[in-house]
């Protein structure tokens, strides 16, 4: 029973709550709808007001800044017309003002004429007085000016003497300074000329040394090629028996012709080798920078400076030869001094180089003061006799060839 009653009570309370909610729900919805509607209307109104404000500002700006000058003039003229119309609204008052002005002018004219006459008389008197006073003042000023001139002349006499003395002293000092500057400039010029002359002498010495080295290299190559070939011929002749003098003349003639042909071929080969080994080819006018006679200086760190100096010396047409290449040789020497590890031989003293070359030539038998020929033993004397016999027999061979 208790549970049933409690259930009924609970159900009643739930029904009441549901009824209340059902009654309140439409009002809540309506309030929500109306509140949202009013909010939207207020926002639309704000937007509308802002749009009107922006449009007004734009129109005002267009009127002020964008309107053409003719319209502005028109507006100004309209304003002036309005102002004139406002000022001329009372014609009666204007007529009264004009009449009063004419009366005043008529009354003021005789007064003005009298005032002018009195003013003219006063002006004439004042002019007379001012003229008399001006003459007296001019006389006084003239007298004062004359007195001042006399005083200034008296004072300027001793001052002029002192000024002349000062000027003469200044002139003397200026002359001394100019003389000192000229002497200093002349001394500096002489020192520069001495330095340049010494540099020219050094460069000329280097040029001559380079030329000598080139000639020595070419001579050494020729001598070495000849020495390489002459020992072979001497060995062949030395191996021949001692009874060569008793051989018939035909064998001598044939050996002579063979020897002459070989000598001509040897000379041609030597000339070709010299041409190949020389750096400058006069036929083509080109310089072989890969020539071993240059010692690889054209490809070192100072290769460009060496090429410039060497080509200038080769193609130089000045007298003496290479005088116009002094600066380039100086640049080359400066570059050599910067790289002593690569150009130690070129930077050594020329006297030491000459001594070294002399010792080498002595060791190889190439010195000019020592004969490079082997000692004159019996075999060598025999070969000389054979050469004499061949030379004596050469005219007979020429005649025989002509007859054939």
From Swiss-Prot:
PANTHER family: COILED-COIL-HELIX-COILED-COIL-HELIX DOMAIN CONTAINING 4. A motif (Cx9C motif 2) lies at residues 325-335. Residues 101-113 have a biased composition (Low complexity). Disulfide bonds join 291-293, 302-335, 312-325. It is a single-pass type II membrane protein. Its cofactor is Cu(2+); Zn(2+). GO terms for cellular component: mitochondrial inner membrane; mitochondrial intermembrane space. One of its GO terms (molecular function) is protein-disulfide reductase activity. Monomer. The chain crosses the membrane at residues 51-71. It is found in: Mitochondrion inner membrane. One of its GO terms (biological process) is protein import into mitochondrial intermembrane space. The CHCH domain contains a conserved twin Cys-X(9)-Cys motif which is required for import and stability of MIA40 in mitochondria. This is Mitochondrial intermembrane space import and assembly protein 40. Keywords: Disulfide bond, Membrane, Mitochondrion, Mitochondrion inner membrane, Oxidoreductase, Protein transport, Redox-active center, Signal-anchor, Transit peptide, Translocation, Transmembrane, Transmembrane helix, Transport. Residues 72-404 are mitochondrial intermembrane. The gene is MIA40. Cu(2+) or Zn(2+).
């Amino acid at each position: 029973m208790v549970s049933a009653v409690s259930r009924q009570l609970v159900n009643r309370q739930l029904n009441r709550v549901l009824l209340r909610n059902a009654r309140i729900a439409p009002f809540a919805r309506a309030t929500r709808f109306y509140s949202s509607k009013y909010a939207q209307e207020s926002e639309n109104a704000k937007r509308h007001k802002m749009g009107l404000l922006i449009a007004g500002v734009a129109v005002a700006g267009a009127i002020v800044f964008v309107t053409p000058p003719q319209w502005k003039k028109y507006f100004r003229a309209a304003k002036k017309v309005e102002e004139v119309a406002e000022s001329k609204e009372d014609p009666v008052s204007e007529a009264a003002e004009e009449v009063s002005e004419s009366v005043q002018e008529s009354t003021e004219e005789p007064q003005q004429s009298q005032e002018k006459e009195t003013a003219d008389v006063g002006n004439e008197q004042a002019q007379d007085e001012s003229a008399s006073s001006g003459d007296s003042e001019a006389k006084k000023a003239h007298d004062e000016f004359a007195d001042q001139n006399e005083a200034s002349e008296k004072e300027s006499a001793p001052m002029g003497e002192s000024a002349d003395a000062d000027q003469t002293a200044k002139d003397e000092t200026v002359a001394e300074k100019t003389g000192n500057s000229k002497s200093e400039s002349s001394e500096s010029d002489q020192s520069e000329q001495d330095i340049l002359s010494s540099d020219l002498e050094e460069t000329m010495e280097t040029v001559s040394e380079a030329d000598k080295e080139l000639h020595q290299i070419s001579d050494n190559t020729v001598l070495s090629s000849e020495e390489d070939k002459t020992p072979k011929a001497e060995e062949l002749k030395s191996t021949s028996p001692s009874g060569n003098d008793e051989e018939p003349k035909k064998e001598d003639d044939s050996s002579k012709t063979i020897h002459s042909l070989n000598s001509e071929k040897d000379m041609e080969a030597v000339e070709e080798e010299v041409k190949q080994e020389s750096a400058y080819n006069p036929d083509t006018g080109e310089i072989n920078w890969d020539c071993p006679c240059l010692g690889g200086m054209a490809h070192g760190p100072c290769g460009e400076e060496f090429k410039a100096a060497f080509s200038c010396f080769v193609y130089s047409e000045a007298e003496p030869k290479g005088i116009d290449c002094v600066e380039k040789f100086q640049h080359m020497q400066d570059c050599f001094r910067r790289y002593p590890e690569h150009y130690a031989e070129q930077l050594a003293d020329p006297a030491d180089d000459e001594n070294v070359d002399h010792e080498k030539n002595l060791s190889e038998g190439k010195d000019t003061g020592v004969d490079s020929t082997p000692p004159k033993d019996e075999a060598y004397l025999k070969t000389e006799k054979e050469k004499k016999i061949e030379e004596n027999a050469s005219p007979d061979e020429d005649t025989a060839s002509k007859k054939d």
